[in-house]
Amino acid sequence: MSVTRGSAGDLRKGSYVILDDEPCEVLEVSKSKPGKHGSAKVRVEARGIFDGARRSKIFPADALVEIPIVDKKTAQVINVYGNVVQLMDLETYETFELPLPEDPELASRLKSGIEVEYWESMGKRKIVRTRGGV
């Protein structure tokens, strides 16, 4: 699994964290001051990268959290058929299939020969945007 560990107190908006075994992008972080008996707490609001679900969790500020490694790669669309997009990675020349993105605007721009950016983390992949000003 492509993860590292980091302190919950170091999380920032826009960083990534694993919540409920799902890689998530941090939307908001709020910290509470330590009391007389107890450590500071960090409340993390995040959205799943692949499923879009919002998640919230509270950690002690010094707790270790898992941070996913999100690889941002480029691929070329080979074919679009039905609800499936066939892609070829431009570095490894590996071909693979992904479901058509849920965003109708992005899905309408996917044509054979177009380059796209896709994210890969924890064995999952997702088309994020088209490349090259299209």
UniProtKB/Swiss-Prot annotation:
What superkingdom does the record give? Archaea
Q: Tell me which family the UniProt entry assigns to this protein.
A: Belongs to the eIF-5A family.
Primary location class: cytoplasm
Q: Where in the cell is it found?
A: Cytoplasm
Any Pfam family:
eIF-5a
Under the heading HAMAP family, the entry gives: eIF_5A
Gene Ontology terms: cellular component: cytoplasm
Provide the protein name.
Answer: Translation initiation factor 5A
Hypusine modification sites? Answer: K36
Q: Which UniProt keywords apply?
A: Cytoplasm, Hypusine, Initiation factor, Protein biosynthesis
- Gene name of the encoded protein: eIF5A
| One Gene Ontology term of the molecular function aspect | ribosome binding
Q: Which InterPro entries match?
A: IF5A-like, IF5A-like_N, NA-bd_OB-fold, Rib_uL2_dom2, Trans_elong_IF5A_hypusine_site, Transl_elong_IF5A_arc, Transl_elong_IF5A_C, Translation_prot_SH3-like_sf
Q: Does the keyword Cytoplasm apply?
A: yes
Which BP terms in the Gene Ontology apply to this protein? positive regulation of translational elongation; positive regulation of translational termination; translational elongation
Enumerate the Gene3D superfamilies for this protein.
2.30.30.30, Nucleic acid-binding proteins
Free-text function comment from the UniProt entry: Functions by promoting the formation of the first peptide bond.
